[in-house]
A protein has these predicted regions:
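Substrate-recognition/cap regions that form aromatic- and gly/pro-loop-enriched pockets
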Residues: 340-483
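Bacterial N-terminal signal peptides that target proteins for export
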Residues: 1-9
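Histidine-centered catalytic/metal-binding microenvironments
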Residues: 463-595
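Second-shell loop/turn segments in exported
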Residues: 115-117, 125-134
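A contiguous strand-loop segment
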Residues: 25-123, 143-313
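Bacterial N-terminal signal peptides
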Residues: 9-19
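Accessory, solvent-exposed terminal regions and/or long lumenal/extracellular loops of proteins
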Residues: 276-359, 369-371, 480
Length: 595
């Protein structure tokens, strides 16, 4: 593979930095036909240096006529406006609601001139308001469109994952600019397109627009703004025939920075889930299978004439655990693997601190941006299941901080109480809380960063044990017991429920069900939090000062022959060969042992 010309690097990196140093996130979408158990799955890493990891919770509510909802910018907390409330809002838990609708996002910026300077609904508010108002993915798309067009869109170009228990969509949108006449923005609203992910396929996006050409007469699978093409023509972004129009080329054109820093993460997710072979349908509808390496020059930003397919078909059915593990990727085993150069230090650290670029020897260079990253606020796998009642079907697998050293725990979306470790207000970025998940996960991740190749595998073993037990055994047992309770209620109230199934049936008859899953959710989250507090103490004792103290099978520490307060022989793992060779080369004359 060739290296990009230095001039290209210099110019493109200036575009890379603003996009990646704000909110840079990653989503993977798994349709129910592509998942191992028939679930719809959506992952989300909410990555930001300014986001505290906590679980947003809003119970269902009925609202009187004239009620208003205050809208605040999700990123900054700035007050934007107030809007009319609807008669009934669904319960929301994080980025899911009680009807098993999931909405997540990644921001790609796009053309600066399309910002609506008078917009009053930001992208975060669109997500959480739509979750309160929509019972299906298609309804959510319409809610988002209606809100943005009525109140004006206050954010940059955005990609949403929008899914429910039956289907999944990728939606992209951006404003139309600011043109004030008589105090009114004549360009208020959004241009947008939404495409249904074919059942059996998967999709991913990571801060770069993904939708290219799209079908103009297939409303079952593609929805779009009537003026999505005409606005591009008016702005001079496009002048070809309608059927050749590409949303991403018009509104979010790629450059080195957006590809290397963003689409490379999509490539990596596809590479993992496809087993290294991308199977997809091309623009002519032909089945194609190509080696993932065929797309690597594009993913690394070397050949911007390339592209990635929007959808691919995985090598095998994808489990919740498998897609959660994708969120822990650091480009291992690829040319972008950060452990393979001296930037990884002496312990193969797969992270690079910000900023995203640096200057050396007259050139500008980048720090890689992998899926797993240090500045994650919270991350999740949303699981929606059409074969289980809504009171049991939705599970938000939720975690905080860096996905590579943190776990996700099951949060049923019908809960009536949030675990204290995830509770809003339990700490923030400037105030430490010993009872907050975000802070204990940061203590563990930051401990691992100092001796990563030695400590992180120890943590990963605990993560895998917990998640495997929950995903493959324990939640199945909870589901079964909860469904028994649900069926008992249905048998008693069948006539009443059947007559109101499509209306707003009170959830009170299912209180036993929701109490059961709430108890399990809270107990599991708090017990695992306590286990992580103990793990952080164990890491300190075990790996203090670069030593590795041996442990027994039960986790206790081995002690010396003479006293229980002194460890048995400690190990000194030292540094990687790469580090030793580099230090010897750079400082050998000073450090070399003389014979």
């Amino acid at each position: 593979m060739h290296k990009p010309h230095l001039t290209l690097l210099l110019s493109a990196l200036f575009l890379l930095i603003p996009a990646l140093e704000g909110n840079s996130c990653t989503n993977v979408i798994i349709t129910k036909g592509a998942s191992k158990d028939g679930s719809t799955l959506v992952t989300y890493a909410a990555d930001s240096h300014y986001l505290f990891g906590e679980l947003y919770y809003h119970p269902a509510a009925d609202w009187k006529p004239g009620s208003l909802l205050k809208v605040y910018d999700w990123d900054s907390g700035k007050y934007l406006t107030e809007i009319d409330q609807v008669p009934h809002t669904w319960q929301t838990v994080g980025n899911m609601n009680e009807k098993q609708v999931i909405i997540t996002e990644t921001t790609w910026g796009g053309r600066e001139e399309l910002m609506d300077r008078r917009g009053r609904i930001d992208y975060g508010s669109l997500i959480y308001i739509a979750l309160q108002r929509a019972s299906t993915a298609r309804e959510a798309i319409q809610v988002i469109v209606d809100l943005a067009n009525e109140y004006g869109y206050a954010s940059e170009g955005e990609t949403f994952s929008i899914a429910d228990k039956n289907e999944a969509w990728i939606m992209e949108l951006i404003g139309k600019g600011t043109n004030i006449r008589n105090g009114v923005n004549m360009e208020k609203g959004i241009v947008w397109v939404a495409m249904r992910v074919p059942d059996g396929a998967i999709c991913a996006h990571a801060n770069q627009a993904r939708i290219g050409a799209f079908p103009l007469n297939d409303p079952d699978n593609c929805l779009y703004a009537k003026d999505v093409i005409s606005v591009a023509r008016k702005r001079g972004y496009f002048d070809g025939p309608d059927e050749e129009f590409s949303f991403k080329k018009a509104y979010g054109p790629a450059d080195f920075g957006t590809v290397r820093g963003c689409d490379a993460r999509v490539w990596s997710a596809f590479n993992i889930l496809s087993g290294g072979w991308f199977s997809y349908y091309d623009a002519q509808g032909r089945a194609v299978t190509k080696d993932a390496s065929d797309f690597l020059d594009y993913a690394m930003g070397y050949n911007l004439d390339g592209d990635l397919p929007l959808f691919i078909y995985p090598r095998q059915k994808v489990s919740v655990k498998a897609v959660a593990d994708v969120m822990r990727d650091h480009y291992e085993g690829t040319p972008m693997d950060m452990t393979q150069d001296i930037g990884a230090g002496g312990n193969a650290l797969p992270y690079r601190w910000r900023p995203m670029e640096y200057q050396a020897e007259g050139g500008t260079y980048l720090n890689e941006r992998a899926i797993a990253t240090q500045q994650t606020g919270f991350w999740m796998v949303g699981q929606a299941r059409d074969y289980v009642p809504d009171e049991v079907g939705g599970i938000l697998w939720f975690g905080t901080d860096d996905a590579a050293t943190s776990y996700v725990t099951p949060i049923y979306t019908s809960i009536t109480e949030v675990p204290d470790c995830f509770r809003q207000g339990n700490g923030d970025l400037l105030h430490y809380s010993p009872t907050a998940s975000f802070w204990i996960n940061n203590r563990i991740s930051n401990a691992c960063y100092k001796m990563y190749n030695i400590m992180a595998p120890h943590v990963r073993k605990r993560i895998d044990a917990f998640e495997t037990e929950q995903m493959e055994r324990k939640t199945h047992a909870v589901d079964s017991a909860a469904i028994v309770l649900y069926n008992q209620v249905v048998d008693k109230l069948r006539e009443k429920i059947e007559s109101k199934r499509d209306a707003m049936v009170s959830r009170k008859p299912f209180a036993k069900v929701t109490r059961y899953v709430t108890d399990y959710t809270v107990r599991t989250a708090q017990e695992q939090f306590a286990a992580w507090v103990s793990l952080e103490e164990e890491l300190l004792v075990k790996f203090m000062d670069g030593n590795v103290k041996p442990q027994n099978e039960d986790g206790t520490f081995k002690h010396s022959e003479y006293t229980e307060g002194q460890p048995a022989k400690v190990e000194w793992p030292g540094y990687t060969d790469l580090w030793k060779e580099t230090v010897a080369r750079e400082a050998g004359e000073v450090l070399k042992v003389k014979e």
